[in-house]
Amino acid sequence: MIQPQTLLNVADNSGARKLMCIRVIGAAGNQRYARIGDVIIAVIKDAVPQMPLERSEVIRAVIVRTRKEFKGDDGIIIRYDDNAAVIIDQKGNPKGTRVFGAVAEELRELNLTKIVSLAPEVL
């Protein structure tokens, strides 16, 4: 579960390395926590030099992995090793051209198929 002030890894090659969540906007209803597939507003805390994204820039991101376990529709419980997000633009397209690490199958059901197609493994 991701809430404001949570630090996340960036799972794409957009140039950012670490994000800090500042607002949960894509959760169902008026929830305080973001889960896999939810959209957040975050600030970049660490970035690669000479890349388009810079430190302290405010961006949108979608959660692709969380340490908090979740139960899939088929009853399987999945927990990842880190909290990770993929940076997206206003239309929901990923800014990077690659996604690192596994992503959840539930992203496909949430119409985030571009992120799923870039991922090397879908669980």
Swiss-Prot record:
GO MF terms held by the record: large ribosomal subunit rRNA binding; structural constituent of ribosome
Biological process according to GO: translation
Alphabetical keyword list: Chloroplast, Plastid, Ribonucleoprotein, Ribosomal protein, RNA-binding, rRNA-binding
Coiled coil (residue ranges): none
Main localization category: plastid
Domain of life (superkingdom): Eukaryota
Subcellular localization: Plastid, Chloroplast
GO CC annotation, single: cytosolic large ribosomal subunit
Protein purpose: Binds to 23S rRNA.
Recorded family membership: Belongs to the universal ribosomal protein uL14 family.
Subunit structure, interactors included: Part of the 50S ribosomal subunit. Interacts with IOJAP.
Name of the molecule in the record: Large ribosomal subunit protein uL14c
Gene: rpl14
